């Protein structure tokens, strides 16, 4: 395992730990999810470039499309919640009422 792979795995781990530890605001959770998706995209791109498998070239692009959809849905949910409740605290949201 090269140093680049270790750094990308460390970035994913730090983003995951940030998602698990700092769950107070929805915006910080969304940023941690974007960090995880970015590290997964870079890792998938490096795997495709190292394997020279032509059918797997679309995998990082599909992952990037899913990351963009996740970001758009997350930001629209953040705007809706902040307009409705006036705050974005995750602890105060009840899933049965939203």
UniProtKB/Swiss-Prot annotation:
GO molecular function terms noted in the UniProt entry: NADH dehydrogenase (ubiquinone) activity
Entry's localization field: Mitochondrion inner membrane
Parts of the chain that traverse the membrane: 1-21, 29-49, 61-81
Gene3D superfamilies: 1.10.287.3510
Alphabetized UniProt keyword annotations: Electron transport, Membrane, Mitochondrion, Mitochondrion inner membrane, NAD, Respiratory chain, Translocase, Transmembrane, Transmembrane helix, Transport, Ubiquinone
The reaction(s) this protein catalyses: a ubiquinone + NADH + 5 H(+)(in) = a ubiquinol + NAD(+) + 4 H(+)(out)
Keyword Kinase found: no
GO biological process, one term: ATP synthesis coupled electron transport
Membrane topology designation: Multi-pass membrane protein
Primary location group: mitochondrion
InterPro entries registered for this protein in UniProt: NADH_UbQ_OxRdtase_chain4L/K (IPR001133), NUOK/Mnh_C1-like (IPR039428)
Superkingdom of the organism of origin: Eukaryota
Enzyme nomenclature, EC number: 7.1.1.2
Gene Ontology CC: one annotated term: respiratory chain complex I
Family membership: Belongs to the complex I subunit 4L family.
Subunit and interaction comment: Core subunit of respiratory chain NADH dehydrogenase (Complex I) which is composed of 45 different subunits.
Purpose: Core subunit of the mitochondrial membrane respiratory chain NADH dehydrogenase (Complex I) which catalyzes electron transfer from NADH through the respiratory chain, using ubiquinone as an electron acceptor. Part of the enzyme membrane arm which is embedded in the lipid bilayer and involved in proton translocation.
Protein name: NADH-ubiquinone oxidoreductase chain 4L
Lineage: Eukaryota, Metazoa, Chordata, Craniata, Vertebrata
């Amino acid at each position: 395992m090269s140093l680049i792979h270790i750094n990308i795995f460390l970035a994913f781990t730090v983003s995951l730990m940030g998602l698990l530890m700092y769950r107070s605001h929805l915006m910080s959770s969304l940023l941690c999810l974007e960090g995880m998706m970015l590290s997964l995209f870079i890792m998938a791109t490096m795997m495709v470039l190292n394997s020279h498998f032509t059918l797997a070239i679309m995998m990082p692009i599909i992952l990037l499309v899913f990351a963009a959809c996740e970001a758009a849905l997350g930001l629209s949910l953040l705007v809706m919640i902040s307009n409705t409740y006036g705050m974005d605290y995750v602890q105060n949201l009840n899933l049965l009422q939203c």
